[in-house]
Amino acid sequence: MPFTLGQRWISDTESELGLGTVVAVDARTVTLLFPSTGENRLYARSDSPVTRVMFNPGDTITSHDGWQMQVEEVKEENGLLTYIGTRLDTEESGVALREVFLDSKLVFSKPQDRLFAGQIDRMDRFALRYRARKYSSEQFRMPYSGLRGQRTSLIPHQLNIAHDVGRRHAPRVLLADEVGLGKTIEAGMILHQQLLSGAAERVLIIVPETLQHQWLVEMLRRFNLRFALFDDERYAEAQHDAYNPFDTEQLVICSLDFARRSKQRLEHLCEAEWDLLVVDEAHHLVWSEDAPSREYQAIEQLAEHVPGVLLLTATPEQLGMESHFARLRLLDPNRFHDFAQFVEEQKNYRPVADAVAMLLAGNKLSNDELNMLGEMIGEQDIEPLLQAANSNSEDAQSARQELVSMLMDRHGTSRVLFRNTRNGVKGFPKRELHTIKLPLPTQYQTAIKVSGIMGARKSAEDRARDMLYPERIYQEFEGDNATWWNFDPRVEWLMGYLTSHRSQKVLVICAKAATALQLEQVLREREGIRAAVFHEGMSIIERDRAAAWFAEEDTGAQVLLCSEIGSEGRNFQFASHMVMFDLPFNPDLLEQRIGRLDRIGQAHDIQIHVPYLEKTAQSVLVRWYHEGLDAFEHTCPTGRTIYDSVYNDLINYLASPDQTEGFDDLIKNCREQHEALKAQLEQGRDRLLEIHSNGGEKAQALAESIEEQDDDTNLIAFAMNLFDIIGINQDDRGDNMIVLTPSDHMLVPDFPGLSEDGITITFDREVALAREDAQFITWEHPLIRNGLDLILSGDTGSSTISLLKNKALPVGTLLVELIYVVEAQAPKQLQLNRFLPPTPVRMLLDKNGNNLAAQVEFETFNRQLNAVNRHTGSKLVNAVQQDVHAILQLGEAQIEKSARALIDAARNEADEKLSAELSRLEALRAVNPNIRDDELTAIESNRQQVMESLDQAGWRLDALRLIVVTHQ
């Protein structure tokens, strides 16, 4: 390779260095200085990864002084080039610019510039780039974008709510599903959609302190959303980095107590410009017209500053009318300002609910009923739809569904409130209780007596808590090394149960981590039982590994021993046997325990085993939960209310379990109260709201559509190709799982989402649900999205050369494959990609400008081509450069028509959809005050900005491939 001092070259492997200058040459090496970075590189002359920079007539070049020149002639003397042409700033002609004075910051970014500069990519990278463009564009156009990537079962009612709310501008809604129906998942789905589409960028989640880690885990494991947990320590640290500590993170979780405890902190939260606020357990925010609580006022203040608000709460019937009104008031204080007026409105919705029930029943409608429906809907031209609904035609069912939808749009709080009940959702298992009464060991009896004497001054509540866990009382006196498990009959029973049910996966829950750890040691040492442990002292990764070991069918752990806090947010529905080694203090925690297995999609009835010690608080509590509340075998929406009402009496019985006088009466009263409250709740159910929240056939179709997309084999092929080219090692572990690890030759040194130790992935939703250590890979997973960004944001694969062996064509025939991208630039919040994502347009031109792309499909053509090494490729490019220039000009002339057609189609679609949505909401606003003015304003503003952005849409050449025909 002939090198001369002063020549300009560019590095093939480090193009970001800009133009290099030859500053030293000897027999074996050459040294290049890259002035823009001040760095030197020493290369072997015989095989240096550099390309000579040579411009041609017609090119525009820049001098190191910054002025530009159109090249008209190129002269070479002693190996050095001089460019002659016209300056663009002064229009002076005949200007000479020696190559040594070229601008050193020059980087070849256009595909044609890279090709002519000899920066030729591997052929497989060009193919990957085109596929990345194609699939990326297709994914933006998918109707359920944002709903496919989460690690959740495809449950229709959850998808229905998320699909409805997630597409809205700044949604402000109340999610009030019954316990176990997945409010957290619904909220996560809405967040995922809003963040993925760009509708939201900053999110604040406020939860009770005990649920912070549960939310942190759920958001990361299910939705790949990495939230930061803010407590006093984190807040203090962040104050060093920013005036407002909350500006240091985009996604934040904090407790309600943390938010309201400090006035300055609350001000910082309000000023942090969140897009979405999520509040869990919102029913604990106490409100009355005269005296709202500090917690309620804190959330009210935040809700005034944050555009989107999701409140997760108990069902309206559990809350009571006034408390329910207080939640709605947080969402829209202008609409819900008068409680008495709200109560009156609710009464007026009964006829609407009756009308919906009438339509769904499928019976013939009388003329009076048809007239009533027409009046309620209040639309012109409704008559044909009413007639269709009342006919025997095939369209009758769809007409009735449309009428139901119109009724629900126009009446009630269905736009701001979503509520599903277990009665309305199928797929829940039965729950069967097995109680095992065991004698109280003498060691515990002695410890309890001594504790009673020494702890006489303790409160009844403290004594009650102690009595629930006799092993801890024993350890207080005997020390931490006391071997309580040697005589506790629950341990013997547990070992016997596990050894006789070796084939069953069993979840064992106890209150404390220490108990779980001690039980694991006993089971392992005495019976060789494989038991995983799960407690709050473990990191998320350690818990993942424990959960994965438990999930393994053949070689996995038979038992998972969980502490109360450690198991929050984790579900193990592949197991159906649960042992409660002790009992939790309140009914909410009991339901949370059972909820680890009692989920939609659980395939078997749940067997709940409760070994309890007689004459302890456990024996009191097991009876109260089962006989008083029926809380083991059914969900208990009344539990907390009754618990609060009998708290003092219950505590006394727990603190003194041997004094049982009157306990039977307490249980009887609780059962009567439970039945009465349950009947009251059932009577107050809002059927109209249930129908709307459930989604019916529409929701079922949504779930089926996403399930079909789960089987997309294009994703697997693309992902494997992507990982190969990035340089990620893949090790197939069987069971639809692959381990990815970084290699020594990565395209980038640190690939986002891939740790040094590697990660386990699966493309199978069922495997991902069973194996929490395996990440569920979809088009929406950060690993794929980061890979797409890496390829498409740089110049990987943007220029290449291939050989086509085809004896039907003359040797030396040239074809140029051009990949144009039609796109529009706009803020992410406009979600312009719904209408015009960056869309590839492929052209395959011969030297006469004939476009053969329609006749020659990309993948078929790609398989017929052979790669060319870089050295040969550079020679070929230099030989045919003029011809390629000519073909490029023909391509530029042809692309406009195709691009304009895409842009016009996008404009028409955007105008039609956004105008229709605006018209629909404006019409509904007349009859349903739950449609906010700011929502209408936002849609109109969004429509105008979208149309303006599409007017500015354009196109550019993204990649090209030069193809030369050969017969060899």
From Swiss-Prot:
EC number(s) recorded for this UniProt protein: 3.6.4.-
A molecular function (GO) term: ATP binding
SUPFAM superfamilies: P-loop containing nucleoside triphosphate hydrolases
InterPro entries: Helicase_ATP-bd, Helicase_C-like, Helicase_RapA, P-loop_NTPase, RapA_C, SNF2-like_sf, SNF2/RAD54-like_C, SNF2_N
Record domain Helicase C-terminal: where: 490-662
Placement of sequence motif DEAH box: 280-283
Keywords: Activator, ATP-binding, DNA-binding, Helicase, Hydrolase, Nucleotide-binding, Transcription, Transcription regulation
Entry binding sites for ATP: 177-184
Subunit structure: Interacts with the RNAP. Has a higher affinity for the core RNAP than for the holoenzyme. Its ATPase activity is stimulated by binding to RNAP.
Family to which this protein belongs: Belongs to the SNF2/RAD54 helicase family. RapA subfamily.
Task performed by this protein: Transcription regulator that activates transcription by stimulating RNA polymerase (RNAP) recycling in case of stress conditions such as supercoiled DNA or high salt concentrations. Probably acts by releasing the RNAP, when it is trapped or immobilized on tightly supercoiled DNA. Does not activate transcription on linear DNA. Probably not involved in DNA repair.
Name of the protein this chain belongs to: RNA polymerase-associated protein RapA
Organism: Escherichia fergusonii (strain ATCC 35469 / DSM 13698 / CCUG 18766 / IAM 14443 / JCM 21226 / LMG 7866 / NBRC 102419 / NCTC 12128 / CDC 0568-73)
Organismal lineage: Bacteria, Pseudomonadati, Pseudomonadota, Gammaproteobacteria, Enterobacterales
Gene: rapA
